[in-house]
């Protein structure tokens, strides 16, 4: 059986056929507390949930949902969480900080979750923080490649996304490259230094990355690519949050924005339902 948060019913509909689909009732009380009410669900159950935005409220709803499923006698619980919140806090950056991604995964493991299907974790090694969980970290390289037909070069804005650029470029059969990022220790200013392995002059360039939040990284990479002679710059981003004035900032440079629907947004050209369906069928 598949049960879904209201904000993920569209995604759950793409999974129909694996099992019956039902909606989780959700309520927010005047004092801010939340409550869920589940349809009758036993046996193997998949919970489909977009946890962004309102990540903290949605995480509590998810914890309550899982606990209610355990009380109801579910034999296996699979979570479909397209965008995993707190994934960017993947290590302890300063003394005294938690590793927030590990905390979330540990809580889910303690709640007797069997597995999680997610899309494009910020760092893949986050999955190792919860060895008891079966974690499927998917990347829509094929879907991006189809949307980026005609591109000449795939570009990562920094070394951290090189594996994404390589995966898409391999399918497109075009070269890929990345910018080396340097931060001035006194001013904090970031400079992007291009590698010399790929010529961007008069090329259609696709920048791939996992998250578009304020747009700063993407716009800097776009400007650098156009300074190097790129004719057009596209962006293929997995999780498009588009915070503050990100839309206007990105549109000021990027010629086309392509996002997935892991987070609901106006540029969600790539749907990830088919990708998730394949993995869910294997787990249930």
Curated annotation (Swiss-Prot):
Cofactor(s), by name? Mg(2+)
Positions binding Mg(2+) 1 in this chain are 122
On cofactor binding, the record's note says: Binds 2 Mg(2+) ions per subunit.
Per its UniProt record, what Pfam families does this chain match? Pribosyltran, Pribosyltran_N
Pathway field of the UniProt record reads: Metabolic intermediate biosynthesis; 5-phospho-alpha-D-ribose 1-diphosphate biosynthesis; 5-phospho-alpha-D-ribose 1-diphosphate from D-ribose 5-phosphate (route I): step 1/1
Q: Which GO terms describe its molecular function?
A: ATP binding; kinase activity; magnesium ion binding; ribose phosphate diphosphokinase activity
Keyword list (alphabetical) reads: ATP-binding, Cytoplasm, Kinase, Magnesium, Metal-binding, Nucleotide biosynthesis, Nucleotide-binding, Transferase
Record: residues binding Mg(2+) 2: 158
Classify the main location: cytoplasm
Q: Which residues form the active site?
A: 181
Q: Which domain of life is it from?
A: Archaea
What EC designation does it have?
Answer: 2.7.6.1
Manganese as a keyword of this entry, yes or no, is no
One GO process term, biological-process aspect: purine nucleotide biosynthetic process
Name listed for the protein in its UniProt record: Ribose-phosphate pyrophosphokinase
What is the originating organism of this protein?
Pyrobaculum aerophilum (strain ATCC 51768 / DSM 7523 / JCM 9630 / CIP 104966 / NBRC 100827 / IM2)
Query: Which classification does the entry list for the species?
Result: Archaea, Thermoproteota, Thermoprotei, Thermoproteales, Thermoproteaceae
